[in-house]
Amino acid sequence: MEMLQGLLLWLLLSVAGVWASRGPLRPLCRPINATLAAENEACPVCITFTTSICAGYCPSMVRVLPAALPPVPQPVCTYRELSFASIRLPGCPPGVDPTVSFPVALSCHCGPCRLSSSDCGGPRAQPLACDRPLLPGLLFL
């Protein structure tokens, strides 16, 4: 009887896990539009712009039982293909490069976080925090 209960519990948890991973609360890794901010200490304003970034859910595993094995690497939603675009900050003094370049996500995938090209730190409390006055809204896709 205990074996049957254990099997039933395993089956229910398996089905629930599959159902939860496909639900609307966890959109899978994909390009989305996001508004970011750019500034330069030598220029008088901060400017916001809209671009595409990679965001969404990546399936992952965590070891439940302690083991002598190293932890399982956790995949993150990151760029598969990208291009770069640039904006010019207005009002920069002569001799200061007003150009700010940024990545534009063309496609995304779940994979290891590469610190050389990605910020792997998770969500920010203030993603649009600027030290300079804010000049709103450019759209670059």
From Swiss-Prot:
It is found in: Secreted. SMART domains: GHB. GO terms for biological process: G protein-coupled receptor signaling pathway. Glycans are attached at N33. One of its GO terms (cellular component) is cytoplasm. Pfam families: Cys_knot. Keywords: Disulfide bond, Glycoprotein, Hormone, Secreted, Signal. The modification Blocked amino end (Ser) is found at S21. It comes from the Eukaryota. GO terms for molecular function: hormone activity. Disulfide bonds join C29-C77, C43-C92, C46-C130, C54-C108, C58-C110, C113-C120. Residues 1-20 form the signal peptide. Promotes spermatogenesis and ovulation by stimulating the testes and ovaries to synthesize steroids. Heterodimer of a common alpha chain and a unique beta chain which confers biological specificity to thyrotropin, lutropin, follitropin and gonadotropin. Belongs to the glycoprotein hormones subunit beta family. This is Lutropin subunit beta. The lineage of its organism: Eukaryota, Metazoa, Chordata, Craniata, Vertebrata.
